[in-house]
């Protein structure tokens, strides 16, 4: 079980209360698909993903990026039981979708990068530490079914 300080809980809650899902989600998933092109294989039904421009302009990518960020809300609401919160999603991604669990970490890194770019200097080391801890716990929970 992960121990959360009151400060970490406050930081994570504050990030999500100000998060522009419609901006950060599409940018983060687009970045992941562009920087790590092998991740595109899981999105073959999304249409044209042949280059950066087509990925950035793809409505399916944007919608899924938003969905992913809203999926993080579940973890935020259940910070003391993140593993159980994502158990069904872990099973789906491992048994049906066959997503490489390393891809969760890649996407988490892209979310962090996009959020940092958006927040600028306000994205302090303390904020980054709490946010990345939260994402690491979610990534671990999503990968549980693979072990």
Curated annotation (Swiss-Prot):
Q: What's any one GO cellular component for it?
A: hemoglobin complex
**Claim: Ribosomal protein is one of the keywords in the record:** no
The organism sits in which domain of life?
A: Eukaryota
Gene Ontology molecular function terms on file: haptoglobin binding; heme binding; metal ion binding; organic acid binding; oxygen binding; oxygen carrier activity; peroxidase activity
A single GO BP term for this record reads: hydrogen peroxide catabolic process
Q: Which residues form a coiled coil?
A: none
Tell me the keywords, alphabetical order.
Heme, Iron, Metal-binding, Oxygen transport, Transport
Stored PROSITE patterns: GLOBIN (PS01033)
Q: Enumerate the Gene3D superfamilies for this protein.
A: Globins
Question: Which Pfam families did the record assign?
Answer: Globin
Could you tell me which residue ranges the Globin domain spans? 3-147
Q: Which residues bind heme b?
A: 64, 93
Tissue specificity remark: Red blood cells.
**Classification via PANTHER family:** HEMOGLOBIN FAMILY MEMBER (PTHR11442), HEMOGLOBIN SUBUNIT EPSILON (PTHR11442:SF7)
Membership in a protein family: Belongs to the globin family.
Additional notes on this entry: This fish has five hemoglobins: Hb C, Hb O, Hb 1, Hb 2 and Hb 3. Hb 0 presents the strongest Bohr effect while Hb 1 presents the weakest Bohr effect.
Give the protein's function: Involved in oxygen transport from gills to the various peripheral tissues.
Subunit description? Heterotetramer of two alpha chains and two beta chains.
Report what the protein is called. Hemoglobin subunit beta-1
UniProt lists the gene as hbb1
